[in-house]
Amino acid sequence: MATNGHFAAIGNGSSDKTAYEHGVQVIDENKEFNANLSKYLTLEDVTPAGFNYHLISVFGSQSTGKSTLLNHLFGTQFSVMSELERRQTTKGIWMSKNKNGGDSSMADNILVMDVEGTDGRERGEDQDFERKSALFALATSEVLIVNIWEHQVGLYQGANMGLLKTVFEVNMQLFLKDRATSHRSLLFFVIRDFVGNTPLQNLQRTLMEDMSRLWDSISKPAGLEHSSVHDYFDFQFYGLPHKSYQPEQFVAETKKLSLRFREGQKDPSLDARKGEFSDGGVFLPEYHRRIPADGFSHYAEGIWDQIVNNKDLDLPTQQELLAQFRCDEILREVMVAFDEAIVPFEDKQSQAARLGEPEILGGLGAAMRASRSKAFKSFETEASRYHKGVYQRKRAELESKIDTRLKALFQGQLDATHKSGITEFSEAVSGAVKAGQKKGTGYDFAEIVNEEVTKAVQKFKEVAHETAVEGAAWSDSQQQLALYEKELAEVSARLRREEMRRLASRVERWVQSRLGESVGLEFNALGSGRAGGGAPEEGEKPTEKKFWDRVWNVFVETVLDAERRFTDRASSFDASLEEVDVGLWRLRRKSWGVLRAKIDEEMVEGNLLLKLRENFEDKFRYDDAGVPRIWRPTDDIEGIYTRARESTLTLIPLLSRFRLAETSAPPPLDRWVGHTPSSATAADEEDLPPIGGVDEEEGKSLEEEMTILSESKRQELTVRFKKAADGVYVEAKRSAIGGMTQVPLYFYGILLALGWNEIVAVLRNPAYFFLLFVCLVAGYVTYQLNLWGPIMKMTEAASNQALVEGKKRLREFLESSDTGRQAIAMSTAGGAGRGEQVEMSRLNKQGKTTAEDEDGDL
């Protein structure tokens, strides 16, 4: 606390409102500026007022009642001089807000500065503070109240002519720095102790003559020599009665005077040069310094810093510096609110990017639009009152900062939509294809792809539209949409290629199954070389010569059928002709590989030897009609054997090379496979085995490709077959020789002589004869039905079963009696003794064991 009670002096950092109840000290007597001025303005609700505030300063000699005048006009509580002591009361510059603000006739937010009086004995000859305070008041205030007594009008010191000359000089100093703008101020002369003997108009004329004389006496820069005081100042005058002698009139007149502190408009019909002055509102728009209330404290501090350091005061520069400071401050405040809304989305997006899991952020677009609009609106509301150039520059900076971050979020949202859309598209297409396959019904792959592409593009557009910020150039998503559609097309093509690969695989498996069955039948037919077997029913010549023709025809027909299947199915994929050509080309190559693998499987040495033996046995053991041969000694076994063996041996050179009987040349595999399509890629060829005669880089000819058995294999196979055939021949010879054993004829004569009596007895006895007849008929029927073998086997099985059952019943009988159990026990004990293990020893030639021989050597 200082001179004024309940005024916050410099150094009082209290935030208690009672400390600022009556006002605040702006500058103390030591020329120190109060940094808490902004706190006072905030407590008085002046800070949010923008330009809706007014600043008044009062000048006058010390102890002339300046503070008293302000207290009556504005209801303030500035300290006044004690009647008992004639000494300085106001030190420095003090400020208070109008306390009569409830009167609607007065302007809002009137700030009053009580300036230290001049010509005081405390400062004496030191006029430095007087000049600095005048310059400060002129740079900040709209209205300068000059408080003088009536009897001082016409005097130089008493009428504050020295102070007014200082005001004119500092105003010219300010004007020189900003010639583009004419800073006008109002000098309001309040004539105290006005008794009316001298008319107010005469006092006005005297004061104006003094003003003109003072203006003419100051030095002016080039070009302003003939300027007038009216070019920079307006004047108003008012007389007040004596406070002590006419207290009631004084209060009434101050009340009336206070009503003039309101907004007004300049009356163009009045001419101050003719002594015509306004008696309306004192706050004209041209008086306002256009400093927003929230920046006034910083502006005033900058002005005072320039003044107290004796630097040339440059108001435009100070306004720009203030604008720079306040715009930066407002920008930071706006960005804090912006961060609260946007940082959570940035964190989510960056975390999703780190995890590699793109996430579409819900509500991002609304948050971006709301935060951007709120930030710009808040900045515009608070900062647009400052220097236009600085405001526009800082607004562009704010827009750049906000849009840079929002653009990153927008791009991240589109990227997440892009990546997740591609993944979902692939999964949706694959799922639809699998569902169609499980149902077993046909599905249109092209229709599935087109439908999913439409869904994916629609979702991308919806997310882009929801996230877009109207008016922001960076929120145009057409380029990203084009890239998205391009990648969708690439993924569609890749999925189509994969589906065609799967289709080709299914067709290849079908070809493999069909060829495995058809070619297997042809090889199985090699086991029968007679007519009616593997050969046609007509003709006697074996069909082995056209074996490869039949294999090739089956192969070509199967592949043609597969190609039709492939082409029909590929048409539903919306595949291009080039893709279909590549698929058919791959199918033919893969099919040849399947055929060759099947041939190699059938031509394995063991399988082929078995086929040759079966072919030989079929020709050797069966006649041309297919009837099995019963070898007799009179048969030409050697001739049949030779013909069958030689016929079978002709198969080995036939099977060793894939040749067509019609052309005696390999099949046209190179023409059948065709040239590599121009649209085929390296990926299309990497899994294809090389084919001799088709792939030049393979280095194998078509003849080599068609070679099934090498020369060494043929010779080895021939030798092994001949050995097998020889075994069959030896077996046939043994069978023929074994059939030569017969019963001698004389044996039947002996049998007849010795058994004649029995024969006669049987023939004479009807019962025996009938029984013999029945037995002969039964034997004949059994023979004709070829049932002797089964009957013998059944008899043997029945006898064995009867033996087992008899043993079982005997054991049960023995176990049921004590004697039997003892016999079984003795048998078991004896068997156990006889079952004792004895180690066997190896004997040498002399009949001795090895151990005995070694003992003998020792």
UniProtKB/Swiss-Prot annotation:
GO terms for cellular component: endoplasmic reticulum membrane. It is found in: Endoplasmic reticulum membrane. Residues 669-696, 825-858 are annotated as: Disordered. Residues 50-300 form the GB1/RHD3-type G domain. Gene3D superfamilies: P-loop containing nucleotide triphosphate hydrolases. Residues 683-696 have a biased composition (Acidic residues). InterPro entries: G_GB1_RHD3_dom, P-loop_NTPase, RHD3/Sey1, Sey1/RHD3-like_3HB. It comes from the Eukaryota. Residues 1-742, 788-858 are cytoplasmic. One of its GO terms (molecular function) is GTP binding. Belongs to the TRAFAC class dynamin-like GTPase superfamily. GB1/RHD3 GTPase family. RHD3 subfamily. PANTHER family: PROTEIN SEY1. This is Protein sey1. It comes from Aspergillus niger (strain ATCC MYA-4892 / CBS 513.88 / FGSC A1513).
